Structure formats: C-alpha cells, structure tokens
Amino acid sequence: MSAPARPAPAAPIRVTAGTTAGQAVRDAGLPSRGAPDAVVVVRDADGRLRDLSWVPDTDVEVTPVAADTEDGRSVIRHSAAHVLAQAVQEMFPDAKLGIGPPITDGFYYDFDVAEPFTPEHLQALEKKMRKIVKDGQIFERRVFGSKDEARAELASEPYKLELIDDKSGADDPEVMEVGGDELTAYDNLNPRTRERVWGDLCRGPHIPTTRYIPAFTLTRSSAAYWRGDQNNASLQRIYGTAWESQEALDRHLELIEEAQRRDHRKLGVELDLFSFPDELGSGLPVFHPKGGVVRRELEEYSRRKHIEAGYEFVNTPHITKEQLYITSGHLEWYADGMFPPMQIDAEYNEDGTVRKPGQDYYLKPMNCPMHHLIYRSRGRSYRELPLRLFEFGSVYRYEKSGVIHGLTRVRGMTQDDAHIYCTREEMRDELARLLQFVLDLLADYGLDDFYLELSTKDPDKFVGSDDLWEEATETLREVAESSGLALVPDPGGAAFYGPKISVQVRDALGRNWQMSTIQLDFNMPDRFELEYTSSDGTRRRPVLIHRALFGSIERFFGVLTEHYAGAFPVWLAPVQVVGIPVADAHAGYLDGVAAELRRRGIRVEVDASDDRMAKKIVNHTNQKVPFMLLAGDKDVEAGAVSFRFGDRTQINGVPRDQAVEAIVDWVNRRENATPTAELVVLPSGDAQSPVAGEG
C-alpha cells in the first residue's frame, strides 16, 4: 500500500529584491534546462507559482519547483499547449483560439477551424512544434492596462473576448486565460531579436523558453463543445502530452498502449459483457448475461459482507415528489445535475382546462433523502444506534455528453449507498470501523494499493459550528492516520455540509482512482429534523455518515475490468471452466465432468462446436476463461483431464475428481490470482509437472 510517488520537497531559496527568481535558482546551483529535475518555476510564500523571470519588490523566500513534480509537469504541459496553438495558427491562419489547459498526464487546446483535424495534420503540427521548441522562443508575461486594451488586441478572437468579459470563471483550473486581479498575456519572443512572434491571453505561469519542453507528442483530436456546454459551438480539440524527459514520455506512451488494450469499453464488446444501445441514450448501459454474472457476484459478496458487519438492507423508489429535494437542498445545490421534472397527476376538464394541478416528480440523483425518511418514520432511541442502512440504489444524474465515459461516467447508475446514524460519542469508533471495512472489502476484490485524502472545510462555504467541524475533522484525521496509510490533505475540498475521507486506489497500471468516500454531514439531520432519544431522555440530533464504497457498481465494474484486463478472478469470471474435447467423441465425457462441477456451483461450459481443438483453445483464451479442461482418448481411458491455462502452460493427466476439487477449492478461496500450472495445487498433494502447451 502506498501513496502516489512524490519527489522530496525542495529546500527554499532566497530571491533578492530587484533580481529574478531564475537568478536565485542559478546562484543556488540548482539543475537547469535539460535535466529531468530542472527547476521550471518557483512557489512563493502564498503558494502561488511564479515564472523564473519574476522580480519581487522585497527579499522573499521561494520554493523551487522541478520539472519532474506534479506542478512542474503541469507548467511544461501548459507551455506545450501554447506551442501547439502557435503551430495551428501558423498552419491555419483563420483558426480561432479556445482554451488550452494542462490536464492529467497531458494538455489540450480547442480551436474553431473550418474542418476537423486529420492524423496528417497532427503529424505536420508536431513537426512545426518541434521547430518552435528548437528555436528557444522566450515566454514573456505582459499585463494589460485595461479590459478595453485586451479587447482591442484580441478583437479577432471571439472566444477570448468571452473569457475577458466573463471573469467569473477566473478560478476554474481549466480556464488558464484569466485569473487573479490582472488580465495578462504571454508573448513568445524571438530569442535573437526579442520581437513578438505570437501570444495568448493567459494567467501563467510558464517555463522560461520553449527549450524547457524536453519531450512531447500529439496524441489525438476530437470534437468538443466550447466550455463543455452542448448549447455552445462545436470546436476541434487536439490532445498531447509532455514530460520532463524522453524516458518519462516513453514510459507514459507504453502505459497508454497497455491502457488501450485494457480499455473496459473495448473489452466490454470483445467479452460480451455490456453495451450502450443508441436507442436508450447516452450514458445508459445494459449488462449482457456474462456481464450480469460478474455484476451479480460483485453485489452478492458485498451484500454478505454488509450483513456480517451489521448493516440493514432497504429499498427506495426511483422517483419522488419535488418537495423531498427542496427539503434536502438538492434543488438548491444540485439542480444542474438532475434530470428535468415530470409533471404527474394533473386532472383536466372536458374543455382542456386544468381542474387539479399536477405535481413535479424527479428521478432521484441520490438515495440519502429517502434513507432519512426511513430513519424518521418512527421514534428512535440511542439503543438503536448506530443504525446502518444500506441499499443498492439506482440513481440518475444529468452528465454533459462530453464527460460521459463508458461505465466510469454514466447517467444511470447503481450506488452501493450506506447511511450511518450514530451518536456523537460513537462517531470515532464508527468511522474507524467503517474505514477498515472499506479497505478490507476493496482488498477482497484485489484492490489493495491505497492512500487516503482528507477534504477539509472551505471557510467561505460551510454549515454547522466551527467546533463541530474541528472535532469531526480531527476525528477523521486520527482515524485516517491510525490506518497506517499515507494521508494527503485536500484543504477547502470538503462539501459545505461536512469533511470527508476519500479512499484512493492504485490499479495494476499504477493509475489512481477515487473509490470510496466517507462523508460526515451536519446539514441533513437538521433539514430532516432527525432525532433520537438519549439516555437522559432528551431529544438529540444523530451524527450522519454517508458512505459509497464502490462509488457505483458500474464504475467499479469498469475499474475492475481494466485492472484485470478482462481476466477476472475465477470467482468473478462469467465462465469459470470450459471443457474442450480433442475430438467429437470426447464431448460426452466432458459433459459428465461439467455436470459434477455444476453440482458444486461452478459455471462451466463444454465447447461442442465444429472448430478444431487448437482454434477452441485460442477462442477461450481470448475470452479469458481461467480453467480449460482438455480430454482425449488417454484421458477418457484414465478417467482424467488435462488443465490448460491462459499462459499456455498445462498439467496433463489429472484424475477428474482431483481436477474438480482443485477448481472448487480455488473458487471457494476467492483467489484473485490468475490460475497457472505453477499455482494450482491438486488435492492429492502430488507435484505437478507443468508443460508448455502448443498454440
């Protein structure tokens, strides 16, 4: 278990008034351009990133930021996005600029152009970018004297004009063009003449020169709505990635290739797990029989563990009257994420006039308000607490079409939602118990590389007393630290109603996924007037804890599919065993073996198709079937089978009763490793002699 790799923080250095930050970096003997740990910007005492050309008015201490840090890579990628935009406008002079932010592992820039970009365009653009990088153009910050000055300079850039006029988006991390108290541009200067070659509206910061971009490539292009709103113009987006060294870029590209092979959307089709029919609409998946098996196993194991942990199962409807979400505050705080209302129960006169107005009903975006109604349905005593309500509840959220992504971002989902009501005195023990339950259950599914994130109060947006927030935050911190996992702070990242712990999981490719959340809520108990009778007879508010362990079943399914590259652990696999006869005459024998396995609860098929045996082995290997049992004349005579595994190894001549017991044992142990000839132990204890198979 580990947190994301982070370079050791750099020691602060002093910048003398009237000199540049870059001079202080050089005086300190720190790495410069060309090294993976070259300093690209500095961080001031307020946490703001500054260009190396920044000149402070007084002596200040700053922290150098290296290229191989998260912030350093982000600056390099932002500068690479500018180089891309310059190349596009040189190749396509009529192109209008959108925005070009750094993103996780890369960058993009949006353009309004007459035709979509082609792969040939990307090749030509990358070549032009390499020339700009080689030229060593200087990034120079310039402050506009006024909005009018900025408008005049950017009169031919309609999207930039919109950003100038709409500074409400200044704090949006994806809108790098505006921010702070100033409107600024970054000009690219010819290093020899210092003449302006190109420029862009931008708040920065940037690397000193284009040569500080050691390694980059363009990856793809796509359509994208301006500012992510489908009511706006459709632009063309070019994606790229940039890194601190060629070695780092090569590693990233290898990871991308492997991620593409593991893409759950691709595997969902190849393995016949799920699909997204156009007739249903965007973000609304259907699970096929094989996907249904995996989903059922996920849910049933979770259900059993929840029952053992003292949870009580509930069920709630998919729609509700408007008033519930007025009470909960969702219509005030979350209306943009909800589907439009349905008006129901109106009554009309014969002439069409309304005799009785209808009521607005909503698809539920969250299960919690309905769980609060269950809690409130009768009086509660402290003796009933903690009360742990759990539901596999379907919810519906309006996601913009541009952000929908396979199973990991959908509009219709099933959440494994729990709400825990406890006393303030029980809060710490319940949180500790809950966190351990979450970690143990995720590990049972094969995800066991964790770190934690603690989201704390936004001082400008919160409900409840400071004392309660402080107590709850410190309690969460103590619980997180006692787990022994790394804890990453997320200052100001909490929702307005309480602090939370997020469990971050690293998958087989080293990618981080936010998986489970444990959220304290000081708002809902008041809104719903939730109470319990304490030991002294007084009425008190319970502490409310929200918890979604998987996030959603759909998202967890997608993450597991990619983590295992579609080769699910045997206990989750849609088909656990397939019998492959050497010839048609051996199919009946394997039917008998299959019948024994079915009686023991194993999902098994016999391939009686007309394909040759070698073809069958290839087909079922591609379908990720974990156990293949082969049988020919010698096996039938000996009452045996031969094991064939996905890594091409075999165990030949295994007595059928031993084969059945070995498979049943593997499934019952919920072993997450992929079975191989080396790992499978036969009940007799005899040593196996694995052999390499053909084909």
Curated annotation (Swiss-Prot):
What domain of life does the UniProt record list for this protein's source?
A: Bacteria
What does this gene product do? Catalyzes the attachment of threonine to tRNA(Thr) in a two-step reaction: L-threonine is first activated by ATP to form Thr-AMP and then transferred to the acceptor end of tRNA(Thr). Also edits incorrectly charged L-seryl-tRNA(Thr).
Looking up InterPro entries in the UniProt record yields: aa-tRNA-synt_IIb, aa-tRNA-synth_II, aa-tRNA-synth_II/BPL/LPL, Anticodon-bd, Anticodon-bd_dom_sf, TGS, Thr-tRNA-ligase_IIa, Thr/Ala-tRNA-synth_IIc_edit
Protein name stated in the entry: Threonine--tRNA ligase
**Keywords for this protein:** Aminoacyl-tRNA synthetase, ATP-binding, Cytoplasm, Ligase, Metal-binding, Nucleotide-binding, Protein biosynthesis, RNA-binding, tRNA-binding, Zinc
Membership in a protein family: Belongs to the class-II aminoacyl-tRNA synthetase family.
Which subcellular locations apply to this protein?
Cytoplasm
Q: Which GO terms describe its molecular function?
A: ATP binding; metal ion binding; threonine-tRNA ligase activity; tRNA binding
Q: What high-level taxonomic lineage is stated for the organism? A: Bacteria, Bacillati, Actinomycetota, Actinomycetes, Mycobacteriales
Q: Looking at its record, which EC class is this enzyme?
A: ligase
PANTHER family recorded for this chain? THREONINE--TRNA LIGASE, CHLOROPLASTIC_MITOCHONDRIAL 2, THREONINE-TRNA LIGASE
Which ranges does the record mark as transmembrane?
Answer: none
Q: Where is this region: Catalytic?
A: 263-569
